[in-house]
């Protein structure tokens, strides 16, 4: 099962993430948990989230990039749900062997995130990748949709289909 942990602070303003979710919903075996809808007060149901994670083979963290990082509720979710004794530490093997995909949208162009004056995705993903590895998750190459503020509908739709294809290819490779 693919579990998408969706963290968009302003989902009603979303153009790119909305299309990505629409495409993902067309696949079988996909569950979407919209954190800002489930937890507007930031009071996370840890047991429910851990139960959802236990059913997943692929975990996707999908969100818009904010100040070169993840939205605050996703950070809190990781802090609370990936608990000692469950996700890491003595007896913390619940996530071992599962896969993690970072699916992020950005307002800037792809060249904006190449090494130079701004850090590239290899640098930006390091804290997330380190978290994944520490918890026994298999880190997958990130999926990024760039220029989301200036893309036309056709481009956004094409990128969303590419996202769906990426998820489908993972399903086919791991579940035949």
Swiss-Prot record:
Gene3D superfamilies: 3.40.50.360. GO terms for molecular function: electron transfer activity; FMN binding; NADH:ubiquinone reductase (non-electrogenic) activity; NADPH dehydrogenase (quinone) activity. GO terms for biological process: positive regulation of potassium ion transmembrane transport; potassium ion transport. InterPro entries: Flavodoxin_fold (IPR003680), Flavoprotein-like_sf (IPR029039), K_H_efflux_KefF (IPR023948), KefG/KefF (IPR046980). It is an enzyme of class 1 (oxidoreductase). Its cofactor is FMN. It comes from the Bacteria. The gene is kefF. It catalyses: a quinone + NADH + H(+) = a quinol + NAD(+); a quinone + NADPH + H(+) = a quinol + NADP(+). Keywords: Cell inner membrane, Cell membrane, Flavoprotein, FMN, Membrane, NAD, Oxidoreductase. Signal peptide: none annotated. FMN binds at residues 8, 14-17, 65-68, 105-108. It is found in: Cell inner membrane. This is Glutathione-regulated potassium-efflux system ancillary protein KefF. Disulfide bonds: none annotated. HAMAP family: K_H_efflux_KefF. GO terms for cellular component: plasma membrane. Regulatory subunit of a potassium efflux system that confers protection against electrophiles. Required for full activity of KefC. Shows redox enzymatic activity, but this enzymatic activity is not required for activation of KefC. It is a peripheral membrane protein. Homodimer. Interacts with KefC. PANTHER family: GLUTATHIONE-REGULATED POTASSIUM-EFFLUX SYSTEM ANCILLARY PROTEIN KEFF (PTHR47307:SF2), GLUTATHIONE-REGULATED POTASSIUM-EFFLUX SYSTEM ANCILLARY PROTEIN KEFG (PTHR47307). Its EC number is 1.6.5.2. Belongs to the NAD(P)H dehydrogenase (quinone) family. KefF subfamily.
């Amino acid at each position: 099962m693919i579990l998408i942990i969706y963290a968009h602070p302003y989902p009603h303003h979303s153009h790119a993430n909305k299309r990505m979710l629409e495409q993902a919903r067309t696949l079988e075996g996909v569950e979407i948990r919209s954190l800002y809808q489930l937890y507007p007060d930031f009071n996370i149901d840890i047991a429910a989230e851990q139960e959802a994670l236990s059913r997943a083979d692929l975990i996707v963290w999908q969100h818009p990039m904010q100040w070169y990082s993840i939205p605050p509720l996703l950070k809190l979710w990781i802090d609370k749900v990936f608990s000692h004794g469950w996700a890491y530490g003595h007896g913390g093997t619940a996530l071992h062997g599962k896969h993690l995909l970072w699916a992020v949208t950005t307002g800037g162009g792809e060249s904006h995130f190449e090494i130079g004056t701004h850090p590239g995705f290899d640098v930006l993903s390091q804290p997330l990748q380190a978290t994944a590895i520490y918890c026994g998750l298999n880190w997958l190459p990130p999926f990024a949709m760039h220029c989301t503020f200036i893309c036309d509908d056709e481009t956004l739709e094409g990128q969303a289909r590419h996202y769906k294809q990426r998820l489908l290819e993972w399903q086919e490779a791991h579940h035949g």
